[in-house]
Every structure is written in C-alpha cells, then in structure tokens.
C-alpha cells in the first residue's frame, strides 16, 4: 500500500526526533539529514517542518502536557515511544483540523513501525487519556455517538 505524503512526513519526523532525543543535534542539522532520507521527496514537507521544528521548539511544554497521562517518568520510555507521543501531543494541540482519532491512529502505526512489540498499545492508551483532556468536546461527542 502506498503511503500518503502526511504519513511519510510523520515517519520522517519520528526518525528526526529519535535522533534529536539521542544526540541533541540542532533542528537544522536534523532537517539537513532528513532531506537526504529515503522518502523525503514524497513527504508533505510543510507538515514535516511544522512537526519537527514545533516539537523541538515546544519540547518542555509538550512534556508538561503529556506527563499526567503517563504511568512512569517520560525518561523511562523508549526514544521511539517518546518521539511518537511528542508528535501526537503536538498535533493534538496545534492541528485541531485533524480529528483526534486520525492522530491517535497515525501514532499507533508509527509505534508499530518503529517501536518495540507492544509499544503501540502503550501509545494508544496514553493518547486516549491525553485526547480526552486536550479535546474534551470532540472525544465526548464521539463517545456519545
């Protein structure tokens, strides 16, 4: 199945944030490396840039929003889970035009692609809690049918 440009952007953002979490390289360095990555030409570059630079710029705020939904300190999560959760938190707060279920489903797929065997289940549970806090009207409307 062919990946959408938005999915490709999220995959590249996950790879870039993983690298940033491990190396603390600048967003410019990571951006330059991603430009040479497989699939870059098929990505939605505007979305990729918004996510990558937005998550790095707002890291502390995103961690603060995410932490109450975690069952352990964020430092104990794998770098892949952290990157995926940070991307989803950024999208939940900044891309309100994207339905929360789409954001969660994309995050689960990223965790399946890049993470450990059951990491996607954890990501799903955390984001369900977080979406209820960040988008209460939208999540309640969905639950009420």
UniProtKB/Swiss-Prot annotation:
Gene3D superfamilies: NusB-like (1.10.940.10)
MF (Gene Ontology): RNA binding
UniProt GO BP: DNA-templated transcription termination; transcription antitermination
Pfam family, one: NusB
Keywords: RNA-binding, Transcription, Transcription antitermination, Transcription regulation
Matching InterPro entries: NusB-like_sf, NusB_fam, NusB_RsmB_TIM44
SUPFAM superfamilies in the cross-refs: NusB-like
GO terms for cellular component: cytosol
PANTHER family assigned: ANTITERMINATION NUSB DOMAIN-CONTAINING PROTEIN, N UTILIZATION SUBSTANCE PROTEIN B-RELATED
Stated role: Involved in transcription antitermination. Required for transcription of ribosomal RNA (rRNA) genes. Binds specifically to the boxA antiterminator sequence of the ribosomal RNA (rrn) operons.
Family: Belongs to the NusB family.
UniProt name for this protein: Transcription antitermination protein NusB
Organism: Burkholderia lata (strain ATCC 17760 / DSM 23089 / LMG 22485 / NCIMB 9086 / R18194 / 383)
Name of the coding gene: nusB
């Amino acid at each position: 199945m062919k990946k959408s440009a938005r999915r490709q952007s999220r995959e590249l953002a996950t790879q870039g944030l993983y690298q940033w979490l491990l190396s603390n390289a600048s967003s410019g360095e990571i951006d330059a490396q991603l430009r040479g990555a497989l699939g870059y030409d098929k990505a939605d570059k505007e979305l990729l840039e918004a996510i990558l630079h937005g998550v790095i710029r707002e890291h502390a705020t995103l961690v603060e929003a995410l932490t109450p939904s975690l069952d352990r300190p964020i430092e104990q999560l794998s770098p892949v889970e952290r990157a995926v959760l940070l991307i989803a938190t950024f999208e939940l707060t900044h891309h309100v035009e994207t339905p929360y279920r789409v954001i969660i489903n994309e995050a689960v797929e990223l965790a399946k692609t890049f993470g450990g065997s059951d990491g996607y289940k954890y990501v799903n549970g955390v984001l369900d809690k977080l979406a209820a806090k960040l988008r209460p009207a939208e999540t309640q409307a969905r639950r009420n049918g």
